[in-house]
Amino acid sequence: MKRERGALSRASRALRLAPFVYLLLIQTDPLEGVNITSPVRLIHGTVGKSALLSVQYSSTSSDRPVVKWQLKRDKPVTVVQSIGTEVIGTLRPDYRDRIRLFENGSLLLSDLQLADEGTYEVEISITDDTFTGEKTINLTVDVPISRPQVLVASTTVLELSEAFTLNCSHENGTKPSYTWLKDGKPLLNDSRMLLSPDQKVLTITRVLMEDDDLYSCMVENPISQGRSLPVKITVYRRSSLYIILSTGGIFLLVTLVTVCACWKPSKRKQKKLEKQNSLEYMDQNDDRLKPEADTLPRSGEQERKNPMALYILKDKDSPETEENPAPEPRSATEPGPPGYSVSPAVPGRSPGLPIRSARRYPRSPARSPATGRTHSSPPRAPSSPGRSRSASRTLRTAGVHIIREQDEAGPVEISA
């Protein structure tokens, strides 16, 4: 009986250990499947350049693997599918001439575009293997950051101003992150320093003298970074501003006075020059008229003080006199020159003879005769006894005196 009981107990113990033995046997057997590994899980790409999605797989099978790359979207997009390195089917137009596969299953994307950004999944399967290997890699595509600059309305600000704004600007770059620096160090937490949600704009509220410093900004993204040149912000005290404004006003006033003082003499000089030119023009006109004026006796007081006779020779036989008839004698009622009286013509003149045109001779100096003295005409040459001289000429001098002198055989009286 004891022997039977011992055998039953040993059998029951064996049944209890059987599941554990079975599990142990399963774990020790080799698994038939593909194992995929990748050195990186995140790759940062640059627009226009290439990115390598690198993977490696291992399998007990020696058959060629079937590789499939997909871009995770709401609806997955198949990038490429191949047996080994041989592409199966037709590539999408977006990836044509930009795809290259390697023996280990890696994928090379050329000429990256912003649309290439996303999560890529690779699946590798082999016919003899039971399990399919999978792996995901994240790819980002960005544009490099161009050099930023700090933009301000003015580099000077008055103390206790309500707000002063600085803007960090750059032309190119995706996914930028901004950092503000004061004197080359990151800004400390200050209730007066306000940043916009994207930290691109810095606003200083209630400006103090301690805000007078150098400011710059730094912009970064996954592939590049840039730092602006520092900008000096000058804070003026209010009392200093009044001094600057008053000094500037005085300088401006002195400048205006100096300009006006220099401008007036030049204007006077211009007027003087115009007057001088006018006088020269008048002198030139006087010089042109002087020869004609010298042939006429002077009028006015000089004639009253020094009257003189004007002798005009007339040729009786000249044919010129026929064209120019003698002027009519002045009537008795017609007034003569003031201060003078002319005696009537002597009746010894031949009225029918033609009068020759007057020939003008230069004036000869003559002494002024005494008042009431009678002058006789100079004696004629004996070679022309039969020719009588007569002159009748009207002369206007200065628009005042008209003197008509007749030279006959008899004398001409000039009374004062």
From Swiss-Prot:
- Annotated localization: Cytoplasm; Cell membrane
InterPro entries referenced in this protein's UniProt entry, alphabetically: HEPACAM_domain (IPR052280), Ig-like_dom (IPR007110), Ig-like_dom_sf (IPR036179), Ig-like_fold (IPR013783), Ig_sub (IPR003599), Ig_sub2 (IPR003598), Ig_V-set (IPR013106)
Task: Briefly state the modifications made to the protein after translation.
Answer: N-glycosylated.
Residue numbers on the Extracellular membrane side: 34-240
Q: Name one GO biological process term.
A: immune response
Region: Disordered; residue ranges are: 273-416
Question: Among its keywords, does the record have Protein biosynthesis?
Answer: no
The record's principal subcellular location, in a coarse class, is cytoplasm
Q: What is the effect of changing residue 98 to C?
A: In MLC2A; retains the interaction with CLCN2; loss of CLCN2 targeting to cell junctions
| Domain Ig-like V-type: start-end pairs | 34-142
Residue ranges annotated for the Ig-like C2-type domain, each copy included = 148-234
Per the entry, induction is:
Down-regulated in 20 out of 23 of hepatocellular carcinoma (HCC) samples and is undetectable in 5 HCC cell lines tested.
The record places the following residue ranges in the Cytoplasmic compartment, namely 262-416
Gene Ontology cellular-component terms listed: astrocyte end-foot; cell-cell junction; cytoplasm; plasma membrane
Q: What is the effect of changing residue 92 to Q?
A: In MLC2A; retains the interaction with CLCN2; loss of CLCN2 targeting to cell junctions
Going by the UniProt record, its keywords in alphabetical order are: Cell adhesion, Cell cycle, Cell membrane, Cytoplasm, Disease variant, Disulfide bond, Glycoprotein, Growth arrest, Growth regulation, Immunoglobulin domain, Membrane, Phosphoprotein, Signal, Transmembrane, Transmembrane helix
The leader peptide range reads: 1-33
Q: What PANTHER family does the record tag this protein with?
A: HEPACAM FAMILY MEMBER 2-RELATED (PTHR44888), HEPATIC AND GLIAL CELL ADHESION MOLECULE (PTHR44888:SF2)
Illness association: Megalencephalic leukoencephalopathy with subcortical cysts 2A: A neurodegenerative disorder characterized by infantile-onset macrocephaly and later onset of motor deterioration, with ataxia and spasticity, seizures, and cognitive decline of variable severity. The brain appears swollen on magnetic resonance imaging with white-matter abnormalities and subcortical cysts, in all stages of the disease.
**Name of the protein in question:** Hepatic and glial cell adhesion molecule
Lineage, highest ranks first: Eukaryota, Metazoa, Chordata, Craniata, Vertebrata
